[in-house]
Amino acid sequence: GHQQNPTTGYNIKGDPAGKIDLESLCKAMGIADVRVCDPYDLQKTEETVKAALSFSGPSVVISRRPCALLKYVKHQPAFSVDQTKCVGCKSCMRIGCPAISMKNGKAQVDETLCVGCGVCEQLCGVKAFVHH
């Protein structure tokens, strides 16, 4: 992440460049099962990966989402943790998000690092994560 790749239409310097259609490339290589998912949607991503794993031949899963670290990517509002709801189960820590840490046994969000992706909200069983 954090740099251009052949599917973005820009080179490593950020200048316009040829763009590769990754799905077409995979199909041209003989991959019959090519699936695309948004990695911010955990349920659909899990369903996509399970379907690909159950396919009888080679399968490709393309996770498509602009890198959150690129300057031109627009972010959603940051999340925060309702400390009265957080039970300290650490489910949110499974994603390794740099914005989430534990303090006094409960999750907290560094709003300067949060890109508002909502993955933490999807993982939290007690709905302690809230948008601003």
Residue ranges of model-derived segments:
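Iron-sulfur cluster-binding cysteine motifs and their immediate structural context
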Residues: 87-108, 115, 119-132
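Glycine/aspartate-rich loop-and-adjacent alpha/beta segment that forms the canonical ThDP
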Residues: 51-102
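Fold-independent oxyanion-binding glycine-rich loops
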Residues: 37-40, 63-66, 83-84, 111-112, ...
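Short, contiguous acidic/charged loop-to-helix segments that flank catalytic cores in large enzymes
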Residues: 10-14, 77, 82-87, 111-115
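Active-site-proximal structural scaffolding
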Residues: 15-19, 30, 38, 54, ...
